[in-house]
Amino acid sequence: ISTIKNAEELDLYLQRFLETIPSHEYQLKELYEYVNVLPESYYGAGSYAKWIRVMWALKNTSNRLLIVWIAFSAKSSTFNYSDIPELCEDWDNREKRDSGVSNRSIIYWAKNDNPDGAKAVRENTIGFYVDNTINSMTASSIANPSSNTKGAGDYDLGVVLHQMFKDEYVCSDVKNGHWFRYRRHRWHEIDSGTTLRKSISTDLRELYKSRVTELQNYLVSLDPEDEKYKSVKAKIDTAMKIILRLGQTADKSNIMKEAKDLFYDEEFYDRLDSNPYLLCCKNGVID
């Protein structure tokens, strides 16, 4: 990276990084997209304090995000490609911090300073995980249309639920099922996560219904004899199975079991005790 000399080389390095991110590390691409919607006040003239905090947050998340940091810095009108070696050296010399800014900080800044851009990134991220659950069964559905498979695993659906509500809910005790919800600038305890459970049959279910509508609208434009038609039809069938599951008591209970692990924050009580008004939990605002 330190040898990059122009915009074309920088774009090549960046695209190579983004294209090689495995699906299980999609959060790195998501963070790049959040960084990309930060306004000029984070990289333009007089932005040093914010600019350097973006670097700290990226470094605290993953050393692999150096290229994202360089690309972000290059958005400045005063950026000089001859400064890249120095920026790389500065990155390498910064130690990761146990506390302070993180990936959650970047998301918070984006939401505050570019809400429309942050909303688009969030919707794109959720869409990625929704499609993962639908596409996971497509091949087997095409091969065996009469299959009784349920469509997606409980964990996979829990991941989608987590992406939708990771800034609103936290599980503080997996064993006893203690849940908190962030509302009106405070964390409130929610009995057994009942409101999140309800969202499985409402918000999460509606998300899949919307995806089915999109796929159905696309399907009518295809030739029934086309292989693409079969693929899209299989996706619709899989999504419909998921929609049915999201209204079933047993399936909702299983998804909530997976959600406990996904929403769990082992340091939640410590942070809440130290400052009940400080929003510094993994699933809350960090700043």
What name fits each language-model region?
Residues 2-143, 173-212:
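Modules that initiate DNA replication and primer synthesis
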Residues 138-287:
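Intein modules and their embedded homing endonuclease domains
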